Amino acid sequence: MCRLIPFGVLDGRDIPLIELSDGRCAVELLPYGAAIRALRVPDREGRMTDICLGYDDVESYRTLDACLGGTIGRCANRIGGAQFTIDGTTYHVTANEGENCLHGGVEGFHKKLWDFTCAENAVTFTYTSPDGEEGFPGTVRVEVTYRLADGTLTIEYRAAAEKDTVVNLTNHAYFNLGGHDSGEVGGHVLTVRADRYTPTDSGNVPTGMLASVEGTLLDLRTSTALESRLHDGAFNGGRGYDHNYVLSGGEQLASELWCPATGIALAMTTSMEGMQLYTAGWLTERVGKDGAVYGPAQGVCLETQHFPNAVNCPAFPSPILRSGETLRQWTTFRFFTR
């Protein structure tokens, strides 16, 4: 079931909250950023729990950073040096994180007002990114569809370009399976089905190499409690995880997250080859939904994607979308208790 609820006004335009429910779970979506605002699932006692960080007003989404729940594009993650070359032509895109381009630039897709259509169990958002937006070549039409059925949220991405360009889409939901207002996620247990990761330089930009997780704190192939990893000063400067994993591939389980306190778990599968694991180490203090105060280490992002900086790394799978081709990607989150 899909219903619209008044949420706010932006630039004179009414912004509704779009709610999908399958009778067991419910997701709240916003046309601003094609974003997930809330996701309510039952805990082991049957109590409905909102497990995504979000805001109570449109203005917070417009003015604050961190991309809470937003659709990220035109190119998710980092492009080293904020430039790339396609067929001999070099393009300079917006540098909004030092010398690099992060999450599509200053006004990425998470800062755009999308059109939408509703169906019984799905919402499709559409946005047309003009040629030259944030420096990226070619006009690109993007569709993002959210489907909710049988306790599973599916996100489907489609894109078509009028000119060869870079497209790398993801969702930046911050999951806290203890409840969005429950504090740090140290009690969560995480598994990531990946034998390798992409090492980075000092700017967190992949160098083009792959490395084994064996013998490192990045090895999450068996269920691992996050508590010891979030504030270890010897690990990523005490900021926790902000690393891209090379998923083992296939339409099998890519990652699983579980909160023993509530019993809520999610199992994630995806068509993508990479996943940025981010445990919100750089999330600055801010007021979220219902007056909750969010801060570092209070969410887990499972950002399925092409590898960061792939357009500048020939050994990585290419994020280039050719004119006349259609990009199709998907990610599913299945919610259950144990």
Regions found by a protein language model. Give the residues of each.
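An exposed, glycine/acidic-rich loop-and-rim segment of catalytic or binding clefts
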Residues: 1-338
